Amino acid sequence: MEERRLFFFIMNTVPERLAALRAAMKANGVDVYLIPVGDPHSSEYLPDHYTSLTYFSGFHGENSNFVVTPTESAVWADGRYFVQAEKEIAGTEIQLMRMGEPGVPTVEEYCGKVLPENGVLGLCGLTASCGLVRGVQKELDAKKGTIKTLNLEDELWTEGRPARPATPAWIL
């Protein structure tokens, strides 16, 4: 696993990935892009294929979200990951949002704040939870903002990406 993580950063840098993401956002009419930690099954242990937040930000934490605008970006981490996040995003433009700390907006509040009037927030509908999407939409309503589902992660992360899991499902 560590070898794969190193490959991420040899291939190109976080600033280059953010530039590519911003270009794709612009091409798709997206003002803000949200990358949550998640997969289509809301798995507790994330398959490597769905580590898009790590790929674009360099941060390896759990229970996180990453928001990118044309001019800024921020990653949310809970208390277990404050020190790790500081180290992993050091030297980048990415702002660390310490979840639960006084004065720190939730990811939903932040999306509502940075989205322009009548703006469009993009996210991959496969990885975002229903609760997250509803919370974000509630914040966007004040600005008449909309959510557009598109998968810029698949479009941009084409080299060295682990395959989607092909393991059998278990009926519980």
Question: PLM ranges: what are they?
Answer:
Residues 9-117, 128-172:
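N-terminal accessory/capping or targeting/presequence segment of soluble
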